[in-house]
C-alpha cells in the first residue's frame, strides 16, 4: 500500500511539474494572441443590443453565447429593412430554466 502512495505522489509531482513547464514555454506571440482574444471578448455586443452589422459578435450569457436574431421591419415609406439584436434563443432559454430549476432542487 505504501508503494502505491509513493508512486501516486511521484506521478502527481511529475504532472504538475510538466504542466508548469508548459506555461513557461508560452512565447510572446501567443501571449499577444491571448490578450487580443480577451480584448475581443470585451468588445462583444451585449444582450438586446443591435447586431445587424456584426452577426457573430454577441456576448456570452450565463450558459450559452447569445445569438443574433433578425426580423424584417417595414418602415412608413414601405421599405423593408433587416434589424437584428443579440438575444437568447427559445431552446437556450428552456435549457437555462431547467438548469436553474435543477440547481434550486439539488443545491
From Swiss-Prot:
Propeptide boundaries: 21-41
UniProt subcellular location: Secreted
Listed Pfam families: Toxin_35
The keyword Repeat is annotated on this UniProt entry: no
Signal peptide residue numbers: 1-20
Cystine bridges: 44-59, 51-68, 58-86, 70-84
Domain comment, as recorded: The presence of a 'disulfide through disulfide knot' structurally defines this protein as a knottin.
Protein name in the entry: U1-lycotoxin-Ls1b
